[in-house]
Amino acid sequence: MPTWMSDISGLIDAHSPDLWFLSYVCLEILAVTLVIDAVMKSRTSQGAVAWSVALIAMPLVVVPAYLMFGQRRFQGYVRALREGNIKLRQLAQFVIAEMHAKYQPQGDIGSDWPSGKVLEQLATMPFTRGNETHLLVDGEQTFNAIFDAIEQAKDYILVQFYILRDDRLGVLFQQKLIERAAAGVRIYLMYDSIGSYGLSRRYRRQLHRAGIKAVAFRTKPINFLGRLQINFRNHRKIVVVDGEKAFLGGLNVGDEYLGRHRRLTPWRDTHLVIQGPAVQAAQLCFLEDWHWLTDTLPALNWRAETRPANQTVLVLPTGPADETETCQLMFVQAINSAQSRLWIVSPYFVPDEPVMKAIKLAAFRGVDVRILIPGLADRKVVQLSGYAHVVDTDIDGVSFFSYDRGFLHQKVLLVDNDTTYIGSANLDNRSFRLNFELTVITRDRAFASEVEEMLVEDFSHSH
């Protein structure tokens, strides 16, 4: 060992008690500073108390954890939306104005359905008429429909998934996109960097070589703390073809979604396909995420065509960049609006106190409340937490069902006989406060009847 290194080592050894003490004092000062941050910024009192106690009691462990998971807002995204390209803001204003002027349901939607006005405020977009929505039950039906649409694409394809795997389905999906790219179709692909963590470099390189613009959704830091943030994930699932068809719902791209998982099979999930003006809202949601990641705005088709089915649809994006807890409020409003029926299906049923109280109040009103959760779990801790909420909601009027026919992953609400909620959001804290989600709200009796028929079948495979 060189002489100078020996001297430094000896100096550290001689003063190590003082250095350890000084380090601990600095850590405690940082912990106290973060306690103030937690109290000021946590969205719930429970979260503020939990972080504060843990930071003071175990600073060595909890300080790094808070820096990675404790921030309540996706500040980089928030700043980008507020200070971003003026062209994006102008485009969003134009699209929303067109929806209001040309495609809003006749009359005031809030006059006979007060929830409609509330949901529009949460979405910052209006319900649109002239839509046609079809259920896609499970993976085979969903991906057959998506692949058919991709094969017919003429101009562009927008793709966004939380999970994109390099397995049989993922490779087939890649091949379909590469074929259309070779035909001159523009393809824009987003995947979440954590959800798609195992995606191989070879897979990504093949996409880029084919001319497909593929980017990973990850925290784009605006400061040092932002570099440590991994807690905010983009959980949305979107495929838009030529601005004419949008596929939205609960399925990602992986073999398990086709029932090929060794343990979680068959896989029960729900997606839907939309045609009509609501497709423009799905495009706008995709474009905001794309612009935040790439600072680019691809030219898209914003000419909507109405469909004979004339369904009323709202596409409602939610996420940690919102000014309020939009996803939680959406669920609370849906539950509070129920007059005769409230059927909830969620793979992760870990609601917070406001949602639990809303469910109990619905039961007290005499609403037929049914909650379907998985019998087979992909995450044991989450399942046990869900069962704890089942026990807590053990009151007359709330019926819980456990799905027995494989793994249940769909996220569906059926309210009364005319309103459905289908999308990517779970009834848990991640969806309420941490994930970017997307839910399609359809107000149409015929479509609600289809959803009812689907859920009755699911209840028949439950106990």
What are the residue ranges of the model-derived segments?
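N-terminal localization/anchoring segments of enzymes in phospholipid and broader phosphate metabolism
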Residues: 1-329, 333, 337, 377, ...
